Amino acid sequence: GWNTIEHEAFLTEMCSLFHSKGIRVSIFIDPLPEMAYGAARCGADRIELYTAAYAENYPLNREEAVAPYLRTAQAARDSGLGVNAGHDLNLDNLEYLLKTIPWIDEVSIGHALICDALYLGLEKTVHEYLIRTHVNK
């Protein structure tokens, strides 16, 4: 993810440019609260949490795997930012992430959805993802 502190000047300029065109800005970051605070200083509307480490560590200890994401999402929320998440999310790990961080606005799911569709079919796969994304509704 972006280092929002090291690249603050560039990201601030890009946020201003996109906002001037009416485009919402989300900055992709690693799960570090200071990166969320940095994204807020840059003028972003949202962050997107890079969830590869969560997905990798989820089978080992889901509470430990989600902890840095919860802290970072809280920092984002405290800063007035929306929260997105994405990378390696799937039918196994998505629901727990959304139950733990219920204020996640959007998730990005790509490869896993297509892989699941090979086994379950596309309609069933989309249905299963919708069930998991509506856990807090």
Question: Where do the protein language model's features map onto the residues?
Answer:
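Short acidic/polar alpha-helix capping motifs at helix-coil junctions
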Residues: G1-T4, A40, N57-N61, H134-N136
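Glycine-rich phosphate-binding active-site loops on the catalytic face of alpha/beta enzymes
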Residues: R46-Y58, W103-L122
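Active-site beta-loop-alpha junctions enriched in small/polar residues
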Residues: D30-L32, Y50-Y54, L81-G82, G86-D92, ...
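Aromatic/hydrophobic pocket-lining residues that form the small-molecule binding cavity
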Residues: H7, L11, L32, A65, ...
